[in-house]
Amino acid sequence: MLELTTQDIQLQQHFANKQAAIQGLAHALTAKGLVAEGYAQGMLNREAQHSTYLGNGIAIPHGTTDTRELVKQTGVTAMHFPQGLDWGDGNLVYVAIGIAAKSDEHLGILKQLTRVLSADGVEQALQQAKTAQQIIAIIKGEAQLTADFDASLIQLQFPASDMVQMSAVAGGLLKNTGCAENEFVADLVTKAPTHLGRGLWLVASDRAVKRTGMSIVTTANHCEYEQQAVKALIAFSVCNDVHQPLLNTITQCVFEQKQDQLLQADVQQLLNLFSGNAEQTIAQRTIAVGTITEETIAAETVAEPDSARAHTATFRIKNSHGLHARPGAMLVAEAKKFESNIRVSNLDGDGQVVNAKSLMKVIALGVKHNHQLQFTAEGPDAEAALQALGVAINAGLGEG
């Protein structure tokens, strides 16, 4: 059976319009010896008759019955358009598969496509794919498109008395649902959780992870960690980026100081809270398929800036309690207003450089009163971003 392989896919393609893209696909089919000259016109004629857009960011340009004699051998070629290509009627295509069909051997690929056309998150995953292997996995339905989170990953009012117990239970839930193995649980209990405010904590690990998932554990007992209240722990097992929609919900709760909404929710309310944000995020095309390392857990990663084009600014934090959840969220919200890649380091800390648009990473910098933050921005609005961040910091990040 004919199958799409990694050798068939051309990444990072850019065309002015779909007609130019179709001609590019026809040229690739010709170069592979699959079709004779003139097949491109047949593909264009077919597109003029009826759009070959299937849905979920996928199109399948092919010839007409009149051009079948130009097909030397049944085969395919594919192109990836990370910026999206207008295919008409408001449809954006991220992967176009050019088909040269001499018989019905190509039906296997079409059968694969029908399985992903109705799946949530496919279009966003194709947009964000970085490798041919990722695209193949998406088309075959093998890629994880959403993080695992259901009632089996929620444990409310567990009688825990310390953070080790909380981490063990949270890790156990992820292990028992097939997201991770025993080594993950052992690693999780050694991690130092991040306090998100009002007794809500977060911890994550990518050790021995099979699927990305999230668990939530609340405690029925009085519990403290580093002299701060512990009411709930959110744990992530991470092997790709599909947990980002869940992190967006958490970030929004912290930014709006609505941790209590999460802490007081029952199982169904928690499921509704996180599924609602996932749907919104899908609509905004933020789901990504990729890998994540231990150093980038719970953070959106950005490329290292080019020092020749980057802009740098240093600001001193005036907040008496440093960057805890509220001012930290305000800082991240300001950074997210800009397109530029923005990284930040605490010059009075360990000097680690992190993504300024990730609340978890910013809080983890341990910024205290009078610490200096150095921001590096690269992009079309880099100078404006640094200026706005300076204004926000000098204004107290919502704390006056």
From Swiss-Prot:
Domain of life, source organism: Bacteria
Location of the HPr domain: 310-400
Residue positions of the active site: 62, 324
Residues recorded as bearing Phosphohistidine in the entry: 62, 324
One GO BP annotation of this record: phosphoenolpyruvate-dependent sugar phosphotransferase system
Induction: Part of the fruBKA (fru) operon, which is induced in the presence of fructose via the FruR (Cra) regulatory protein. Transcription is repressed by FruR in the absence of fructose. CRP activates expression of the fru operon in the absence of glucose. The two regulators can work independently to control the expression of the operon depending on carbon source availability.
Predominant cellular place of this UniProt entry's protein: cytoplasm
Compartment list: Cytoplasm
Pfam family, one: PTS_EIIA_2
Keywords annotated in UniProt: Cytoplasm, Kinase, Phosphoprotein, Phosphotransferase system, Sugar transport, Transferase, Transport
GO MF annotations in UniProt: kinase activity; protein-phosphocysteine-sugar phosphotransferase activity
Result of knocking out the encoding gene: Does not affect growth on glucose. Mutant shows a slight growth retardation on fructose.
Residues annotated as domain PTS EIIA type-2: 2-142
GO CC annotations on file: cytoplasm; plasma membrane
General function of this protein: The phosphoenolpyruvate-dependent sugar phosphotransferase system (sugar PTS), a major carbohydrate active transport system, catalyzes the phosphorylation of incoming sugar substrates concomitantly with their translocation across the cell membrane. The enzyme II FruAB PTS system is involved in fructose transport.
Domain notes: The PTS EIIA type-2 domain is phosphorylated by phospho-HPr on a histidyl residue. Then, it transfers the phosphoryl group to the PTS EIIB type-2 domain.
Name of the protein in its database record: Multiphosphoryl transfer protein
Source organism: Vibrio cholerae serotype O1 (strain ATCC 39315 / El Tor Inaba N16961)
